[in-house]
Curated annotation (Swiss-Prot):
Zn(2+) binds at H567, H571, C669, H673. Binds 1 zinc ion per subunit. The lineage of its organism: Bacteria, Bacillati, Bacillota, Bacilli, Bacillales. It comes from the Bacteria. It catalyses: tRNA(Ala) + L-alanine + ATP = L-alanyl-tRNA(Ala) + AMP + diphosphate. Catalyzes the attachment of alanine to tRNA(Ala) in a two-step reaction: alanine is first activated by ATP to form Ala-AMP and then transferred to the acceptor end of tRNA(Ala). Also edits incorrectly charged Ser-tRNA(Ala) and Gly-tRNA(Ala) via its editing domain. Its EC number is 6.1.1.7. This is Alanine--tRNA ligase. GO terms for biological process: alanyl-tRNA aminoacylation. Belongs to the class-II aminoacyl-tRNA synthetase family. The keyword Cell membrane does not apply. SUPFAM superfamilies: Class II aaRS and biotin synthetases, Putative anticodon-binding domain of alanyl-tRNA synthetase (AlaRS), ThrRS/AlaRS common domain, Translation proteins.
Length: 880
């Protein structure tokens, strides 16, 4: 067996399958862009679903990839076991209806055992198969020469995730030797059992059935291969180390942590070893996730990152690290992964800034949170309970930023548990935000549909043409082929030549008409068909449309003209955002319509008003410079060398379309654009907002829409100036003057209210009653708010010197209640807080406060008199 680095194993795997005719699929972003069912990309096949379910036909049915992945369903096990990770790489080879079992098994065996590749000793490999998969048994036994005693039949060797492709699988195991297990009485000591000796190297899934919605299984029209090999586990075997953490994929981070902490890994302290592992794992995950656009927050993906960072900081204390340090490990991760993921080093400064910011925030609250938790645990032990209440756990989460998982880990160390149900009840809406994570499900659609069978060519000519003669080459109604569509019917069609742009890259589809003698067809929408053709959604307005009919295809040029202005403006906006906010800004989504543009981008803070103004000014300056927009076809590598921005979630071929706006903006883009920026006219931002963790949104208008917006705003300004009897240019001065007048009137009103309050307080002293020797005043008064009520209370307490006073007022069906007790009566047991709570409860409210002064509110004005009558009862109850 060769001595290889993790990076060499990854590259060797891809090279091997490239030699076998596979296309190398780039590793996709960890943040899914096409699959709303996933929180993270969590497997090698997750990004290929569109191929397996037939929505998209790949150029090459043989695919291989090394896909970065995140799984967070067992975070608490990371560091405790040899192979649990939150971030990992899955190496895979896939066949979309091409080769099947024999090739998959043969190639796997060749890669693992050939001296040209990994070079495993064949005698150390065993396999598992499904009990009924005789074909796999025959291939392994007769062709590969694996003895039948090393071919183990297991019922669980069937891959099934619900609806969609399913089938038997075979797994390959490597025997690491007796040092990892030699007790043959152990029922788990076999390939496929829970043990450290026989490690799974590779899982080959043979997708040959559709699991239908009714629970039945039918053969797939096209059989598929889906395989997965964990790079970290494979590296641990090749490098002959006890755990994945001891490989060169993790040791640089562990080594850097040793330097920072002064502690040593594998120095006989298992708790410290666990801390090293947790830190190494979590910094890999956070580094890659932030690099792909996720940012720490209290919801969804952001909550996962926050939880991982805070868990790592908590474990760092076991290594005597009491300062932010994780950010220092970001460039270490970048160096380890630079061969295949150079973007990590390119973004290291931004990633480190995000990590450091989050660490600093947590350190600010961690000390207080730990102290409070220690008190909670001590109190629970005094009360002889082993449960931390949900209320206390929630207070730690809400006030001190303590993730519930950390509270649970601390509790476990103290031999206690947390009342999870109570915590969840306390979370209410906050819990919904924190847990608003989409489920890590992994499902595919059932294969089928006639559109995937349509191979006929369709040429898009809409970049330079708005109308063209064409022929209907495919016609579909209700999911089935048809020869015609009658007036009033809807359907889908393909043209051999089309000027209609299919929705993609954020740009909406063209609309327009297909015309022929006696036939008028409205084109409502255009999308990409599975094999890449433009698929037109149509309604026949007049006549009958037939397959093979000759038509004139005409797009709505007014609509297209507005769309292209907005699309080119998004390119200018993207670059302006980078110029003003920083190079960390990346497009996270966009929508380009004829009315407006919407641009989503990564940024971990609100865009300030002065920044928005600067961004808007830059875009308009580029418009007014009348810059030519040049579009060219380039080899992908040449385009990247030019500095063209490639966008997350987009797939690019070997030749790409480059859109260049002078020397200012350079992007890979398949959309439609203006010829010169002057055509855009003007650009106006209408809104900026946050739409999720670390993602901001700008909405803007251009051209006619921008003119109409500003014209409306000028109209409103003139109308407002008219109402204020001034000129638009003087309106700010007039507004300032009005504010000053209002402020003066408020001051005069408060002075008058205080005088009236003093007068009314004097009149109220005549209503004082004596109850068991105590002066008691309970009255409904006419004051505007709680402030006036307090002023009156102070006057009454000063005048009466010794009294229990309760005042109530009603404004807009809202009841304000204030209770006061003079100092001499507090010592006798009278308590304003307790009294006001009882009074408020009798008119549908609640409240409380100090012994001398307390306030409350009520919801039922009709019950105020009855509530005030209780004051005498209260005084009597205390005097007893």
């Amino acid at each position: 067996m060769k001595q290889l680095t993790g990076a060499q194993i990854r590259q060797m795997f891809l090279d091997f399958f490239q030699e076998k005719g596979h296309a190398v699929e780039p590793s996709a972003s960890l943040v899914p862009h096409e699959d709303p069912s996933l929180l993270w990309i969590n497997s090698g096949v997750a990004t290929l679903k569109k191929y397996f379910d037939g929505r998209v036909i790949p150029q090459n049915p043989r695919i291989t990839n090394a896909q970065k992945s995140i799984r967070t369903n067992d975070i608490e096990n990371v560091g405790k076991t040899a192979r649990h990770h939150t971030f990992f790489e899955m190496l895979g080879n896939f066949s979309i209806g091409d080769y099947f079992k024999e090739e998959a098994i043969t190639w796997a065996w060749e890669f693992l055992t050939s001296d040209k590749w990994i070079g495993f000793d064949k005698e150390l490999l065993s396999v598992t198969i499904h009990p009924e998969d005789e074909e796999a048994f025959t291939i392994w036994n007769e062709k590969m020469g694996v003895p039948k005693e090393r071919i183990i039949r297991l019922e669980e060797n069937f891959w099934d995730i619900g609806e969609g492709p399913s089938g038997p699988n075979t797994e390959i195991f490597y025997d690491r030797g007796e040092a990892y297990g030699n007790d043959f009485s152990d029922p788990e000591l076999y390939p496929g059992g829970e043990n450290e000796r026989y490690l799974e190297v590779w899982n080959l899934v043979f997708s040959q059935f559709n699991h239908n919605p009714d629970g039945s299984y039918t053969p797939l029209p096209k059989k598929n291969i889906d395989t997965g090999m964990g790079l970290e586990r494979m590296t641990s075997i090749v490098q002959d180390v006890p755990t994945n953490f001891d490989t060169d994929l993790f040791m640089p981070m562990i080594g850097a942590t040793e330097t920072i902490s002064g502690e040593k890994y594998r120095n006989g302290d298992l708790e410290k070893d666990m801390a090293f592992k947790v830190i190494a794992d979590h910094i890999r995950t956070v580094t890659f996730a932030v690099g792909d656009g996720a940012l720490p927050s209290n919801e969804g993906r952001g909550y996962v990152l926050r939880r991982l960072l805070r868990r790592a900081v908590r474990y760092s204390k076991k290594l005597n690290i009491n300062r932010p340090f994780m950010f220092e490990l970001v460039p270490v991760v970048g160096e380890v992964m630079k061969d295949f993921y150079p973007e990590v080093l390119e973004k290291k400064d931004f990633i480190a800034k995000v990590v450091k910011n989050e660490e600093e925030r947590f350190h600010e609250t961690l000390h207080d949170g730990e102290a409070i938790l220690a008190e909670v645990i001590a109190k629970a032990k005094e009360e002889k309970t082993t449960v931390i209440s949900g209320v206390d756990a929630f207070r730690l989460y809400d006030t001190y930023g303590f993730p519930i998982e950390l509270t649970e880990e601390y509790a476990e160390e103290a031999g206690m548990t947390v009342d999870q149900e109570g915590f969840e009840n306390e979370m209410e809406k906050q819990r919904e935000r924190a847990r608003a994570a989409r489920q890590d499900v992994d499902s595919m659609q059932v294969q089928g549909g006639v559109l995937g069978e349509v191979k006929v060519a369709s040429e898009f000519v809409g970049y330079g043409t708005v109308a063209t003669e064409s022929n209907v080459v495919a016609l579909v109604k209700n999911g089935e082929y048809t020869d015609s569509l009658q007036a009033g019917e809807e359907g889908q069609l393909m043209l051999n030549v089309t000027p209609f742009y299919a929705e993609s890259g954020g740009q909406i589809a063209d609309r327009g008409y297909l015309l022929a003698d006696g036939v008028k067809v409205l084109v409502k929408d255009v999308q990409k068909a599975p094999n890449g053709q433009n698929l037109h959604k149509v309604v026949v307005e007049e006549g009958t449309l037939t397959k093979d009919a000759a038509v004139k295809a005409i797009i709505d040029t007014k609509n297209r003209g507005s769309v292209v202005k907005n699309h080119t403006a998004t390119h200018l906006l993207h670059q302006a955002l980078k110029d003003v906010l920083g190079t960390h800004v990346n497009q996270a989504g966009s929508l380009v319509t004829s009315e407006r543009l919407r641009f989503d981008f990564s940024h971990f803070g609100q865009v300030q008003a002065d920044e928005l103004e600067k961004i808007e000014r830059i875009v308009n300056e580029k418009i007014w410079e009348s810059i030519d927009v040049e579009i060219s076809q380039k080899a992908i590598e040449e385009a990247k060398e030019m500095g063209a921005m490639a966008l997350f979630g987009e797939k690019y071929g070997d030749v790409v379309r480059v859109v260049q706006v002078g020397d200012y903006s350079l992007e890979l883009c398949g959309g439609c654009h203006v010829d010169n920026t002057a055509s855009i006219g003007i650009f106006k931002i209408v809104a900026e907002s946050g739409i999720g963790a670390g993602t901001r949104r700008i909405e803007a208008v251009t051209g006619k829409s921008a003119y109409e917006l500003m014209n409306d705003q000028v109209g409103l300004l003139k109308e407002a100036a008219g109402k204020m009897k001034t000129n638009p240019k003087d309106i700010l001065t007039r507004v300032d003057g009005l504010f000053a007048e209002v402020k003066q009137l408020q001051k005069e009103n408060e002075s008058l209210a205080a005088k009236l309050s003093n007068i009314e307080a004097g009149n109220l002293t005549d209503s004082v009653m004596t109850v068991d020797g105590v002066n008691v005043l309970a009255a409904k008064v006419n004051v505007a708010d709680m402030n006036n009520l307090r002023t009156m209370m102070d006057d009454l307490k000063n005048k009466l010197e010794s009294a229990v006073v309760v005042l109530a007022s009603v404004n807009d069906d809202k009841v304000n209640i204030l209770a006061g007790v003079t100092k001499d009566l507090i010592s006798q047991g009278y308590h304003a807080g307790k009294l006001v709570k009882e009074v408020a409860s009798r008119c549908g409210g609640g409240g409380g406060g100090r012994p001398d002064m307390a306030q409350a509110g009520g919801k039922n004005p009709a019950q105020v008199e009855e509530a005030l009558a209780f004051v005498q009862e209260y005084v009597k109850s205390v005097s007893k």
